[in-house]
Amino acid sequence: MEQNKRMHILMCQNSTEGILCGVYEAFTSRYGHAWQKLAVGPYVNGDLFSDIYSVEVNTEKAGKVVKAIISKISEEAWYLVHMASEADSQEKGEIIYRFLILAFANGRKVLNAMSIPEVMGLHQLSRSVSRETQHLYGFLRFQELQNDILYARLVSKHHVGMFLAEHFQDRLPMENWVIHDVERDEVWIHRAGEDWLYIRHPDFRQDPQMMLSSSEYAFTEWWKTFTESVAILERRNPKLQMQMLPKRYWKYMPEMFTNPGR
């Protein structure tokens, strides 16, 4: 009878909570891991031999999965899963699901089994997200607006805004600041002395260049002039520059605004 079972594709929301809820449903359904796949929405291509089920986000269920990962595997496993879940990848749901099947059965020792594709895949996704997050700790640029709020526009391959918000809450705890993911229409807002808040705001479109404080505008111009004046023409190496500072980050870095030859 097993060979006649239809494949179940669990379509999850493209978020950490969404994927964790998919994992919860897969483990509690008892349908069989061999007959289930996790896919990240909003759209999944099925076939004549598969049934697609939409997984609703449930914070309580997601929390149970997090607790199980930490207690039955390790905190490191949760770190890897969390990072991987924010990757720009259509395969991340299935990779996380297959990894957790192995890890719940074998414990934390599976984390070092790099010869297993599911383990290697999880590490690769997590490493890619972590690397971009580390880059943006240095590449993200805040600018002072006329209302004394520090504003930063974010462009990233992976969904790393939350990790940046946590970092800058520690670094700038007594500042009012906003991190705006301009491509995903997401905003992280921090009031001085408080925890950051997250909102999804598709209408958050106003160009902050029109609201820069006078001192910020002057500093931006001085900074551009400085970076241009210290550059040595004979030592320009655009290829190396793009390796050290990928071009996708240039758009919202003041020192790169309208610089000639870039």
Question: Predicted regions: what is each one?
Answer:
Residues 39-134:
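Charged, alpha-helical interface segments at or near domain boundaries
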Residues 34-47, 177-185, 200-202:
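A generic structural motif
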Residues 2-57:
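N-terminal ordered "arm"
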Residues 53-57, 194-208:
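Acidic, Ser/Thr-rich peripheral helices and adjacent loops at domain boundaries
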